[in-house]
Regions:
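Short, structured "edge-of-domain" segments at secondary-structure transitions
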Residues: 1-182
Length: 182
């Protein structure tokens, strides 16, 4: 442990324009699901991600996943195994939500699979892992929010587009979605 005046240890050397958006702890046996803004999901095992030292710069996602031009990872879900009683709630920028059984994404393809069908100009902003009875809250840029139980959205298949989660007006769009626990 550190005493007073401790300075800590530098964990990572970053370039000026780089920043750490998310940090995950995973085993080599864990399944990592990477969701992109275009609605695709890439499935990798932990051992397929390059290991690096404490001060390494890391590896760009485009060098690990076959991403298209302009495509980026917006959400990551890590699990040891796929459970039948768990779900994933997908939320798009235009307010669409989709609830899919977690087990439905236990498919591996090198190029990824389509997890949600998106409308023109829409993009996936978050994926939330739920237990089947969680409350979800959506928030928009103009300060609107809605909270609903995930059971209000029926489970759908992989190719479904989802249902409207929040009504948007003007140029408003969804900026965040999370699980809400009382």
């Amino acid at each position: 442990t550190q005493s007073r005046g401790g300075r800590g240890v530098n964990a990572q050397n970053l370039k000026d324009e780089d920043y750490v958006k998310s940090l995950y702890v995973a085993s080599t046996h864990d399944h990592l699901l990477f969701f992109t803004d275009k609605g695709r999901v890439h499935h990798r095992k932990g051992y397929q991600i390059p290991e690096a030292g404490r001060t390494a710069r890391g590896t760009a996602m485009v060098n690990i996943l076959p991403l298209e031009q302009g495509e980026s990872v917006t959400a990551t879900v890590i699990t040891r195994e796929f459970f039948e009683d768990e779900y994933l709630m997908m939320v798009t920028q235009k307010g669409t939500v989709k609830r899919i059984p977690f087990i439905a994404l236990n498919t591996r393809r090198k190029t990824g699979i389509r997890a949600i069908t998106l409308d023109e100009g829409d993009q996936l902003i978050n994926v939330i892992r739920t237990n089947g009875n969680d409350n979800i809250i959506l928030a928009t840029r103009e300060g609107m929010a809605i909270c609903f139980n995930e059971n209000d959205v029926r489970p759908m298949g992989r190719d479904a587009a989802g249902v409207r989660g929040i009504m948007l007006t003007g140029n408003d769009y969804v900026i965040g979605a999370e699980k809400w626990e009382e």
